[in-house]
């Protein structure tokens, strides 16, 4: 099994699986059905991904919506079981995401970290709240990084690889990334990318800030997802993903709607190539990775097509 932390300097390739959208009700029949659905999904996805030996890790996000007061509504369940199950079937490592903003106390967060580590999951993406306008009960991301490092030392935990999210379009993002790196981030996962201008500018600025601060930059994992139709736009809007008009027209407004996913894959490959070419001159010290996301359940075949193309590309490196 490839160690995920060790792979961070060698173009890691990740696949992100959408979690099961459900919640436990206390009804034994319903809750048992959830477990069976998880087990079936583990076997189905594992079989689908078995043809990609170059895959480094399986990532599963946590789906959380917030109301107008910032209170959470959890829309996913058994994310650790899903990630661990698929990873074990494939002989890969699991990555799990956790929204830390809604943790009620230090003890609650510490308990979650300890439980996650005890389940053999040592790669964690710590995620903040949706907006700066709410006063959240939990730690911010840098604080969560520091708490995790503290628990590793005081509880004698395995070496946990800490990830955070970066939003290329957000103002001041390079500075935030620097602070999160200093507080313990080993890697960043970007929001889904459909153009390269914002991320190349961000990587250049982040590299310069790290150099001035004498800090080794974290690996930045670039996220991509295929689009199959205009129906995907609502989800992108909900996720806050920027899809430039020119790119939207190219992928989705073409006469051959059935070929939208192919144009989407080509666009992603072109964006990655542009970033990698820019890296040579402007941020050679920053290691890059690739994350292919399953945007929806029906997009899975197209996500696999995209993964196949990136898999071929990484094998050539």
Identify the residue ranges that each predicted region occupies.
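Non-catalytic positions within long, well-ordered alpha-helices that form the structural scaffold/packing
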Residues: 50-51, 117, 181-182
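Active-site pocket-lining/capping segments in soluble small-molecule metabolic enzymes
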Residues: 1-7, 31-51, 125-131, 137-167, ...
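Glycine-rich anion/phosphate-binding loops
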Residues: 32-41, 75-78, 101-115
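Structural preference for beta-strand elements that scaffold enzyme active sites
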Residues: 10-16, 55-59, 93-95, 122-125, ...
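N-terminal amphipathic alpha-helix/helix-capping segment at the start of soluble metabolic enzymes
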Residues: 1-18, 22-35, 87
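Glycine-rich, proline-tolerant flexible connector loops at the mouths of alpha/beta enzymes
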Residues: 38, 50-77, 129-139, 190-206, ...
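Flavin-dependent oxidoreductase catalytic cores
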Residues: 2, 11, 70-97, 107, ...
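Active-site beta-loop-alpha junctions enriched in small/polar residues
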Residues: 16-23, 61-65, 97-102, 129-132, ...
């Amino acid at each position: 099994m490839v160690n995920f932390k060790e792979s961070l300097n060698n173009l890691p390739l990740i696949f992100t699986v959408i979690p099961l959208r459900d919640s436990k009700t206390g009804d034994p029949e319903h809750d048992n059905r959830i477990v069976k659905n998880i087990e079936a999904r583990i076997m189905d996805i594992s079989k689908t991904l078995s043809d990609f030996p170059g895959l480094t890790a399986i990532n599963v996000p946590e789906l959380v919506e917030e109301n107008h007061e910032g209170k959470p509504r959890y829309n996913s369940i058994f994310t650790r079981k899903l990630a661990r199950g698929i990873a074990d079937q494939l002989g890969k490592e699991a990555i799990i995401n956790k929204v830390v903003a809604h943790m009620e106390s230090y003890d609650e967060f510490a308990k979650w970290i300890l439980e996650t580590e005890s389940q053999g999951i040592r790669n964690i993406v710590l995620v903040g709240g949706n907006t700066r306008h709410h006063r959240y009960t939990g730690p911010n991301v840098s604080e969560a990084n520091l708490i995790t490092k503290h628990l590793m030392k005081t509880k004698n935990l395995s070496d946990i690889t800490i990830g955070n999210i970066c939003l290329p379009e957000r103002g001041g993002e390079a500075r935030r990334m620097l602070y999160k790196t200093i507080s313990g981030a080993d890697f960043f996962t970007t929001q889904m990318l459909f153009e390269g201008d914002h991320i190349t500018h961000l990587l250049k600025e982040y590299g310069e800030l790290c150099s001035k601060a004498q800090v080794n930059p974290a690996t930045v994992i670039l996220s991509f997802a295929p689009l199959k139709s205009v129906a995907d736009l609502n989800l992108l809007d909900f996720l806050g993903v920027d899809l430039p008009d020119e790119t939207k027209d190219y992928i989705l407004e073409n006469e051959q709607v059935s070929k939208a996913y192919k144009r989407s894959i080509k666009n992603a490959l072109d964006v990655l190539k542009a970033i990698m070419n820019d890296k040579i001159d402007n941020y050679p010290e920053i290691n890059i990775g690739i994350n292919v996301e399953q945007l929806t359940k029906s997009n899975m075949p197209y996500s696999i097509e995209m993964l196949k193309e990136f898999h071929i590309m990484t094998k050539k490196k």
